[in-house]
UniProtKB/Swiss-Prot annotation:
It holds the Pfam family Ligase_CoA. Belongs to the succinate/malate CoA ligase beta subunit family. Heterotetramer of two alpha and two beta subunits. It catalyses: succinate + ATP + CoA = succinyl-CoA + ADP + phosphate; GTP + succinate + CoA = succinyl-CoA + GDP + phosphate. Substrate binds at residues 260, 322-324. ATP binds at residues 49, 56-58, 98, 103. Succinyl-CoA synthetase functions in the citric acid cycle (TCA), coupling the hydrolysis of succinyl-CoA to the synthesis of either ATP or GTP and thus represents the only step of substrate-level phosphorylation in the TCA. The beta subunit provides nucleotide specificity of the enzyme and binds the substrate succinate, while the binding sites for coenzyme A and phosphate are found in the alpha subunit. This is Succinate--CoA ligase [ADP-forming] subunit beta. The keyword Iron-sulfur does not apply. Pathway: Carbohydrate metabolism; tricarboxylic acid cycle; succinate from succinyl-CoA (ligase route): step 1/1.
Length: 395
């Protein structure tokens, strides 16, 4: 479960990680009141930050400085309802401003390849860390973390030294790193990331932004996470998917993906990403696994979720029939399109194979829906869906 920034901030504060004051607002009036609470006089600055589970908020206009409660209200009015990479902004966080001297980066995450944990740190924070890792990999220190030991004082000192932190800030950063490890360990997280971790002009080291992903498999140990999950599912698409017990993850691309089985869906994401490189750089818009034995109703529900995403420009349905029969999938597609009627105009590329494939193809052929195209292979279907999305984006 990915947390919103304001939720990550609250979890940080719970475990002693230094953070600035922040208040969540869902209306303009609430934003104004929050700014009044956080500003202490002339010259006080707050930051109005869109709460969405995607990057690029600043570039999209989702982060604005405000020097008065009225400016905060105006910023909130502009940000609330904004679409950022397909994510609608339903709430903002009004955060205290800070006078920043330096920006750093730190994260700890599950390292599946090595069956361990990995800490990453850099003295160059506040940038796209993926870009930094590619262009200047030496600027990003990577330190393995023993799951049985964690990040104690010695390991924190090793991380700080590997990243090249200056002596005058190394101790404070190491202390914050240990507290961030406590968040990771105590909350059963798979990712804790701070970008930027900052040193202010008065010498404090503060987590200015935060990203936390909690392990859903550890929910039984954390009944308190239920409240976080309810708020984290406030996105209408995620809430709709959850209501139908669909395994859905929103991504930032333009090609909607539906498949049966996590392995097939992951493979489909890869194939669509490769196809997108040939068609203007379009990418997968989501992960959606309808599971084994899915009925026509489940297929229709999944299609309804994906077609409701304004970021999606085309859909690729890739099903290998086993327990899930291809004729049930075909009926679900026809059913969903009948319900949506003229409201929907996004092209669907469908690749069926396996159990009842001929029956499924016959159902779609008989329906003869103008939006549906049948593909013989996964590669061919991915290419057609990527091409359709690119055409829609450039139209």
């Amino acid at each position: 479960m990915d947390l919103f920034e304001y939720q990550a901030r609250d979890v940080f504060e719970k475990h002693g990680v230094p953070v600035l004051g922040g208040i969540v607002a869902t209306t303009v009036d609430e934003a104004r009141a929050a700014a009044e609470t956080l500003t202490s006089g002339a010259g006080s600055v707050v930051v109005v930050k869109a709460q969405v589970k995607t990057g690029g908020r600043g570039k999209a206009g989702g982060v604005k400085l405000a020097r008065s409660p009225e400016e905060a209200a105006e910023a909130a009015e502009q940000i609330l309802g904004m679409d950022i990479k397909g994510h609608t902004v339903h709430r903002v966080m009004i955060a205290e401003g800070a006078s920043i001297a330096e920006e750093y980066y730190f994260s700890v995450l599950l390292d599946r390849a090595n069956r361990s944990y990995l800490a990453m740190a850099s003295v160059e924070g506040g940038v796209e860390i993926e870009q930094l890792a590619v262009e200047r990999p030496e600027a990003l220190a990577r330190v393995a973390v023993d799951p049985l030991v964690g990040i104690d004082a010695a390991k924190a000192a090793e991380i700080v030294a590997a990243a090249g932190f200056a002596d005058d800030v190394a101790g404070a950063v190491a202390d914050v790193i240990q507290k961030l490890w406590t968040v990771y360990d105590a909350e059963d997280a798979t990712l804790v990331e701070v970008n930027p971790l900052v040193r202010t002009t008065d010498g404090r080291v503060i987590a200015l932004d935060g990203k936390v992903t909690l392990d859903d498999n550890a929910e039984f140990r954390h009944p308190e996470h239920a409240e976080l999950e309810d708020a984290a599912s406030a996105d209408p698409l995620e809430a709709k998917a959850k209501a139908h017990d669909l395994n859905y993850v929103k991504l930032d691309g333009e090609v909607g993906i539906i498949g049966n089985g996590a392995g097939l869906v992951m493979s489909t994401l890869d194939v669509v990403a490769y196809a997108g490189e040939r068609h203007g750089g379009v990418k997968p818009a989501n992960f959606l696994d309808i599971g084994g034995g899915a009925s026509a109703a489940v297929m229709a529900a999944g299609l309804d979720v994906i077609l409701g995403d304004p970021q999606v420009k085309s859909v690729f349905v890739n099903v290998f029939g086993g327990i899930t029969a291809c004729d049930e999938v075909a009926r679900g597609i026809v059913q969903a399109l009948e319900i949506l009627g003229d409201k929907e105009n996004k092209p669907l590329v469908v690749r069926l194979d396996g159990n009842a494939v001929e029956e499924g193809r016959a159902i779609l052929a008989e329906a003869n829906h103008p939006l549906v195209t049948l593909a013989e292979t996964m590669d061919g279907g991915a290419d057609a869906a990527a091409a359709a999305a690119h055409s829609a984006v450039t139209a």
